[in-house]
Amino acid sequence: MKVKSAAKKRFKLTKSGQIKRKHAYTSHLAPHKTTKQKRHLRKQGTVSASDFKRIGNLI
């Protein structure tokens, strides 16, 4: 089954079956954000349950 190239670049499937994603708001207009905010945004997030099926079909 073919996968969407855009989704392939943005999401990764973990061994436990969750989908990893990057946080938004990380690069543009970063100087006014606090250090704590930028540090938390650096970490990987997971796709929410409501979006899981839709994104799972793309990858």
Swiss-Prot record:
The keyword tRNA processing does not apply. Residues 30-43 have a biased composition (Basic residues). Gene3D superfamilies: 4.10.410.60. GO terms for molecular function: structural constituent of ribosome. It holds the Pfam family Ribosomal_L35p. InterPro entries: Ribosomal_bL35, Ribosomal_bL35-like, Ribosomal_bL35_CS, Ribosomal_bL35_sf. One of its GO terms (cellular component) is cytosolic large ribosomal subunit. Residues 1-22, 30-49 are annotated as: Disordered. Transmembrane segments: none annotated. GO terms for biological process: translation. Keywords: Ribonucleoprotein, Ribosomal protein. NCBIfam families: rpmI_bact. Belongs to the bacterial ribosomal protein bL35 family. This is Large ribosomal subunit protein bL35. It comes from Mycoplasma pneumoniae (strain ATCC 29342 / M129 / Subtype 1) (Mycoplasmoides pneumoniae).
